[in-house]
């Protein structure tokens, strides 16, 4: 069976509530359907399709003849719903001009035959992909499937209504307004509880109708991948199914409906669907829009795109409510109809979020000529959005954020964050600029995110706005890669949502922690618990009021194992008895309030469940290697962005100030600092991008040497650049009027954080000697 092919898995026994008189149907078809009774001895078999939440659909087979029957559901129905006579009419018109639909054969309005109206069409043998990720196909085939689908949609919207003789099939102009009104009424008629988001979304849609609400095209109304039948072997559409919601209206409503999966809320499971991943060969939304517009010969700048996306989610929420309403009445064909009660609200809330977003539906024209490390298409698009967001929202707020911490330096609020940060976070979430660091969530490569990290490095609080701040990024990496399902549910999800923060407890005050095997904090098993005892310091972020969980590295005693197999990582909630925050540690006099400070923490007989252990005993160093690789790339690329900002400040000051009767830049020493800064920035950027590329192509282990090299080179170079910038700015450079003093503290401490330079240099030398030994005949 081909992946996604129709077959036995799509069929089931007829549900009790949908059973009808098969003998009556057979007698009717013998009389009215040509060829149906050709095999007199053959038995009519009937099975019901599992798919479909609205009009029950059945597979009929008599001998070698196969058909599909669609009927109205039994019982009390919502007004103007389930009009299968319209389905039959539009399919007949489309089939007559060669548009890919199943051939409609017979319509019966006599409800005495099987209890409701019904129609019969030919059975089309092909592939239906129930899972939008289309597992089992190559990325190229997957892409071809999506391209063929959107080309078919463009073909539909290019048809002439008059030539189809479908005048009067829909009311015509004013479609969007009618849709909002109709679906509001449909929802209200089916609602079983009050959901404010539905009311708010309905009101927003009615107040933001497109100015041009007079487009009149034939639209499908429920155009999505699992309503398409593809050729058994080719990536070609051979039939479009389920025309129940078709009408004359605005074509962008179909295109938006097809694009829903790009924004589907993570908390809502897509029934019969896998998880959408941008790395899977599925074209981006902008690429599909470009193909659609090219096929129709229209401009790819689509006005009111956010309206149509919001409308689609409003309709989906209304459909979900209708499915659940029919479940309560006992006349729904789906076994999982009860699930729909809980998805109405998140769908409505997603629609509200999309209503506030601004979209560019045009593919960005980015020149990648000469790029050594090429971004993905999505990476290019996200980088453009991040740059715009930084310029429009983050950098203008820098002064306000800085003043907040100056004013609250000695207050109880000093570990909190100004309100503007929360506002910026909500805006970033709405724009889809959230959790960009995690490839499995963002769909970005390490090279993609490295360039984004460079941008966020230009402002000290920018990573936090995008939920890409350390140490949470590393901790989320750990939980994503190594956490159990229970650990992910309890801690990873709220971290990804930005509802809580975390800290990482590794370094200790009583040992040389640059050699991590020295770590003495003990993690001892006691029946179904572990007991933690020890001292930690430089636990970044522990002062944040939202810090709820710590990942602690400690020794699980087993001296029979190698020294790299004696340490483990464990989750410790910050409110666990025995966890005591001792004091904040300053960095060059800065307490780093914004990032939640750096704290000394003592663990005294701290008891946590054994299920809090991550991956297993003795796996601590294994986890550390997986955690630190990406984190070091992020740190180093942010310092590149920081260096760019410092160089900008240096150049601005050098062109503004006069000393000894000439501009500062005219003094050769300053000119040389500027030149040396540019050279250094380009060198460390290339080296860091090479490390990111190695992560993408070789994995963390294959990129070890490059990562160690950037960890030495980047902080060293940038510390010097910031120092030069301070020198050019004079006394102002170390004052609160410029960010340079804070920049220097950040970059200088990076020569210690995640391992001091000397440890990395020793590791680089060892790896280099090993690599050279492979090439030399002499034994080293």
Curated annotation (Swiss-Prot):
One of its GO terms (molecular function) is long-chain fatty acyl-CoA dehydrogenase activity. The modification Phosphotyrosine is found at residue 324. Substrate binds at residues 514, 629-632, 755. Pathway: Lipid metabolism; fatty acid beta-oxidation. Coiled coil: none annotated. GO terms for cellular component: cytoplasm; mitochondrial inner membrane; mitochondrial membrane; mitochondrion; nucleus; peroxisome. The modification N6-succinyllysine is found at residue 391. Pfam families: Acyl-CoA_dh_1, Acyl-CoA_dh_M, Acyl-CoA_dh_N, APH. FAD binds at residues 504-514, 538-540, 657, 727-731, 756-758. The modification N6-acetyllysine is found at residue 177. It is found in: Peroxisome; Mitochondrion membrane. Widely expressed with highest levels in brain followed by liver, heart and kidney. The keyword Transmembrane does not apply. Gene3D superfamilies: 3.90.1200.10, Acyl-CoA dehydrogenase/oxidase, N-terminal domain (1.10.540.10), Butyryl-CoA Dehydrogenase, subunit A, domain 2 (2.40.110.10), Butyryl-CoA Dehydrogenase, subunit A, domain 3 (1.20.140.10), Phosphorylase Kinase, domain 1 (3.30.200.20). InterPro entries: ACAD10_11_N, Acyl-CoA_dehydrogenase, Acyl-CoA_Oxase/DH_mid-dom, Acyl-CoA_Oxase/DH_mid-dom_sf, AcylCo_DH-like_C, AcylCo_DH/oxidase_C, AcylCoA_DH/ox_N, AcylCoA_DH/ox_N_sf. It is an enzyme of class 1 (oxidoreductase). GO terms for biological process: fatty acid beta-oxidation; fatty acid beta-oxidation using acyl-CoA dehydrogenase. Keywords: Acetylation, FAD, Fatty acid metabolism, Flavoprotein, Lipid metabolism, Membrane, Mitochondrion, Oxidoreductase, Peroxisome, Phosphoprotein. Homodimer. Belongs to the acyl-CoA dehydrogenase family. Acyl-CoA dehydrogenase, that exhibits maximal activity towards saturated C22-CoA. Probably participates in beta-oxydation and energy production but could also play a role in the metabolism of specific fatty acids to control fatty acids composition of cellular lipids in brain. This is Acyl-CoA dehydrogenase family member 11. The gene is ACAD11.
């Amino acid at each position: 069976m081909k992946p996604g092919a129709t077959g036995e898995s799509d069929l089931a026994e007829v549900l009790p509530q949908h059973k009808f008189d098969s003998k009556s149907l057979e007698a009717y078809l013998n009389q009215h359907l040509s060829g149906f009774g050709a095999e007199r001895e053959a038995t009519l078999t009937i099975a019901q399709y599992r798919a479909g939440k609205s009009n029950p659909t059945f597979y009929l087979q008599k001998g070698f003849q196969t058909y599909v029957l669609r009927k109205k559901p039994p019982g009390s129905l919502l007004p103007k719903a389930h009009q299968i006579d319209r389905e039959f009419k539009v399919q007949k018109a489309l089939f007559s001009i060669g548009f890919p639909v199943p051939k409609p054969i017979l319509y019966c309005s006599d409800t005495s035959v099987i209890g409701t109206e019904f129609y019969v069409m030919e059975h089309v043998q092909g592939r239906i992909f129930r899972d939008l990720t289309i597992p089992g196909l190559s990325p190229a085939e997957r892409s071809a499937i999506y391209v063929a689908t959107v080309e078919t949609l463009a073909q539909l919207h290019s048809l002439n209504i008059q030539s189809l003789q479908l005048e009067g099939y829909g009311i015509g102009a004013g479609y969007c307004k009618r849709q909002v009104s109709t679906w509001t009424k449909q929802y209200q008629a089916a609602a079983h509880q009050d959901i404010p988001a539905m009311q708010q979304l309905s009101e927003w849609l009615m107040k933001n109708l497109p100015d041009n609400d007079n487009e009149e095209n034939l639209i499908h109304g429920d155009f999505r991948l699992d309503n398409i039948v593809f050729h058994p072997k080719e990536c070609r559409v051979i039939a479009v199914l389920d025309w129940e919601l078709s009408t004359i209206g605005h074509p962008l409503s179909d295109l938006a409906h097809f694009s829903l999966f790009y924004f589907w809320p993570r908390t809502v499971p897509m029934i019969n669907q896998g998880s959408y991943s941008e790395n899977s060969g599925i074209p981006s939304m902008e690429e599909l829009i470009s193909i659609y517009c090219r096929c129709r010969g229209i401009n790819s700048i689509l006005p009111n795109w956010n309206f149509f996306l919001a409308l689609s989610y409003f309709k989906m929420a209304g459909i979900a409510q209708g499915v659940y309403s029919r479940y309560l009445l006992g006349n729904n064909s789906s076994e999982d109809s009860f699930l729909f009660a809980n998805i109405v609200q998140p769908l409505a809330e997603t629609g509200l979020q999309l209503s506030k977003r601004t979209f560019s539906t045009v593919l960005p024209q980015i020149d990648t000529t000469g790029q050594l490390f090429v971004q993905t298409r999505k990476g290019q698009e996200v980088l453009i959005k991040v740059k715009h967001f930084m310029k429009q929202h983050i950098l203008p707020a820098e002064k306000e954020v800085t003043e907040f911490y100056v004013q609250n330096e000695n207050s109880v609020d000093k570990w909190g964050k100004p309100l503007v940060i929360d506002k910026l976070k909500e805006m970033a979430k709405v724009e889809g600029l959230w959790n960009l660091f995690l490839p499995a969530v963002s769909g970005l490569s390490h090279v993609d995110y490295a360039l984004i990290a460079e941008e966020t490095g230009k402002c000290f609080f920018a990573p936090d706005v995008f939920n890409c701040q350390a140490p949470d990024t590393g901790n989320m990496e750990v939980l994503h890669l190594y956490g159990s399902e229970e650990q992910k549910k309890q801690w990873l999800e709220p971290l990804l949502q930005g509802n809580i923060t975390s800290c990482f407890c590794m370094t200790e005050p009583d040992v040389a922690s640059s050699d991590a095997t020295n770590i003495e904090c003990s993690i001892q098993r006691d029946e179904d618990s572990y007991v933690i005892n020890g001292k930690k310091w430089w636990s970044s972020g522990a002062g944040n009021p939202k810090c709820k969980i710590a990942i602690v590295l400690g020794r699980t005693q087993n001296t029979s194992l190698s020294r790299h197999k004696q340490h483990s990582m464990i989750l410790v909630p910050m409110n666990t008895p025995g966890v005591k925050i001792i004091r904040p540690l300053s960095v060059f006099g800065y307490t780093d309030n914004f990032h939640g400070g750096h704290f000394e923490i003592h663990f005294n007989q701290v008891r946590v469940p054994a299920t809090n252990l991550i991956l297993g005993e003795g796996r601590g160093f294994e986890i550390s290697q997986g955690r630190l690789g990406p984190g070091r790339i992020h740190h180093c690329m942010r310092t590149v962005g920081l260096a760019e900002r410092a160089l900008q400040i240096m150049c601005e000051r050098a062109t503004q100030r006069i000393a000894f009767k000439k501009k500062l830049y005219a003094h050769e020493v300053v000119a040389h600092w500027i030149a040396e800064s540019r050279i250094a920035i380009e060198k460390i950027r290339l080296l860091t991008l090479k490390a990111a590329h190695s992560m993408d192509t070789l994995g963390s282990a294959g990129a070890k040497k490059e990562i160690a090299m950037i960890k030495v080179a980047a902080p060293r170079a940038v510390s010097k650049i910031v120092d030069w910038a301070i020198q050019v700015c004079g006394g102002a450079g170390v004052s609160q009027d410029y960010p340079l003093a804070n920049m220097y503290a950040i970059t200088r401490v990076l020569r210690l954080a995640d391992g001091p330079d000397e440890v990395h240099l020793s590791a680089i030398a060892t790896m280099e000697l090993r690599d050279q030994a492979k090439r030399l005949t002499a034994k080293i």
